[in-house]
Amino acid sequence: MDGDLKIVPLAAAPGFSLVEGDPDPRGMPVIGVDDAAGGTVVEIWVDRSEHMIRYLEVQTAAGRRVMLPITFCRVISDRVHGRKVIVRAIRGEQLEGVPGLRRPDRITLFEEEKVMGYYGAGTLFATPGRRDPIL
């Protein structure tokens, strides 16, 4: 692993695959807290050292490709709710504002921090109701 990229697209990670029986989120719409679709999952990014999914790559309505941390979303695939990815941190339209990657085949630690900060801030400020005091 020395010198190799740690987090890469699934397509660039030989020997890695989704567990049989688990839903494949590629092609699923990404739905925000406002129940609006903001994009479609186009790729899965895996952490080769930890053997886990870290990000979903989403193509937005405007054609941008942005990262969605797996810890900020839920993949749903059943007969009742259909196939979709739910993100409660931001509104669907706010996917357009996610900080992008400098290179399409890798994510730096600094870029990870910016992406996580965007979704983290969304949990507090994405909607007007979240901005007001609870008490």
Residue ranges with predicted function:
Residues 1-135:
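Peripheral interaction segments used for macromolecular assembly
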